[in-house]
């Protein structure tokens, strides 16, 4: 409860809301529980907002990309294949230190692709710190995976 009281998501949520409504295509990325959040929210974005949403959760796609390009580059390769004009990439990393998510952030920076990040744990985590041109950069101050992932899901559901 204390974590939620100090969540302070309003400013970053309004930035996210603006980005969400000004992009037709959305790619949502995350590992583990964050990938589950991506899967769930992608359905709502498609159903309620008619957004074109892509996520990397298909086992055969994941194993092909990891086998051919390594796990650290698999999600970046997914972006290379799926990013189109008017795409917003949402990068989630509970701890903000996932190399594969950091590679996606750097790819977005280099290729001028609009993106935003959702992180937790340490306030000065690598992804949060390197998200120079992020349209939104929300951090939840908690070291609990469950709290971070649930708050990220609440944040993303704010437009539903």
Task: Label the predicted regions.
Residues 27-160:
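Glycine-rich phosphate-binding loops that contact phosphosugars or nucleotide phosphates
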Residues 3-23:
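A short, well-structured juxtamembrane/interface segment
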């Amino acid at each position: 409860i204390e974590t939620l009281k100090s969540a302070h998501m309003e400013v970053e949520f309004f930035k996210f809301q603006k980005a969400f409504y000004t992009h037709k295509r959305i790619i949502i990325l995350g590992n583990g529980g964050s990938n589950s959040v991506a899967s769930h929210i992608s359905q709502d974005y498609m159903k309620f907002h008619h957004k074109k949403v892509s996520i990397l959760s298909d086992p055969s796609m994941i194993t092909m990309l990891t086998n051919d390009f390594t796990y650290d580059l698999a999600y970046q390769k997914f972006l290379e294949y799926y990013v189109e004009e008017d795409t917003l990439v949402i990068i989630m990393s509970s701890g903000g230190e996932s190399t594969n998510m950091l590679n996606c952030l750097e790819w977005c920076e280099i290729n001028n692709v609009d993106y935003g990040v959702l992180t937790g744990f340490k306030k000065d985590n690598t992804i949060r710190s390197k998200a120079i041109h992020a349209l939104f950069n929300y951090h939840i101050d908690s070291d609990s995976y469950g709290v971070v992932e649930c708050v990220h899901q609440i944040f993303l559901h704010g437009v539903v």
